[in-house]
Amino acid sequence: MPRFLYLCLGLLLVRVSRELNDISRARRLCGQHLLHEIVKLCGDVNWSHVEKEKPFTQLLSQASEKVESFIPDRSESSQTTFPVWRRATNPVPTSASQEEAINNMKMQSLPEYQYKKANLPFKTRQEESSSSQDISPYIHEIIEFQKKNTNKIKTLSNLFWGNHPQRKRRGYSEKCCQKGCTKEELIIACLPYIDYENLRKHQQL
């Protein structure tokens, strides 16, 4: 009987040590593999529930697009056995060109909108203004939530990357893809999701 007990205790210790090694061991994760690992660490997601909620699905798809900023190349480097990673070839528009495009769209759509608004009956215009006032508090709440998350992510970024500017430029996904991330480092990505869940629960009460 004592021998069986020692055997069980030994197996338990081996399992615990393996789990501890797994937490501290850095794994190289890229693209969908990185996103799936983060989702798994943040908690089991009820996908049938997520499909009904458009905003959260869009958040996941946006996160997926950001994570997949590196595309694997089939060729391999002569110095290493790992695949060579290159940046996506699609050019990203600059902020100046984006601003110019938005201004052009505003200039084109504004006269037409004003003309339609001027021809609306007085009652309809009152309803439109009252509906926009009803939406304003909700928009303000979303903006405050985004500011809070941005500040938190900046603080965590400094803790995670330190004061090294080159590391900050490389970014989270590139570091996990090229050098590897531990589970402790990946858990940092769960904090915005936890805040989102808490906000949803608060709104439901």
From Swiss-Prot:
SMART domains: IlGF (SM00078). Coiled coil: none annotated. GO terms for molecular function: hormone activity. Residues 53-166, 202-205 form a propeptide. InterPro entries: Insulin-like (IPR016179), Insulin-like_pep_6 (IPR017100), Insulin-like_sf (IPR036438), Insulin_CS (IPR022353), Insulin_family (IPR022352), Repro_Hormone_Insulin-like (IPR051042). Keywords: Cleavage on pair of basic residues, Disulfide bond, Hormone, Secreted, Signal. Disulfide bonds join C30-C177, C42-C190, C176-C181. Residues 1-19 form the signal peptide. PANTHER family: INSULIN-LIKE PEPTIDE INSL6, RELAXIN. May have a role in sperm development and fertilization. This is Insulin-like peptide INSL6. It comes from Bos taurus.
